[in-house]
């Protein structure tokens, strides 16, 4: 993965190094075999936009055959996948294919102390907000059912609705979601 990381790094120069490293360490090998470096960089940039106040990012890529690739990057919550699929269906989108990835649990960071003889408070490096939380990268290939449009207006509505649902999940309000 080091070679791939070195290929992706220049494609997302504004992403903090700890976030880029976390992305590469916590996603499994299958993810990195499935996507190209430019696509991985786009997913990294979407992940970099997540904060405890901004829980998800949605990107739409219109395809020439009236299909659309929808990428959802968010913090991971119980029942989230079912909610996403239900929401796509409620918007009249037939899910033809989905690539679903969840970050592995974060391992405990190494202590900043270098020996047992060192005293005083530990100095913690400034961490990216939300870095330790598990995240998802879900990529859906969808096609609107006959009579349904997925223009910019509908894309914006879908992203807003998804954000509202994920906010409810974050608050533990599963029934309301």
Model-derived features: positions:
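Non-catalytic interaction/regulatory segments
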Residues: 1-177
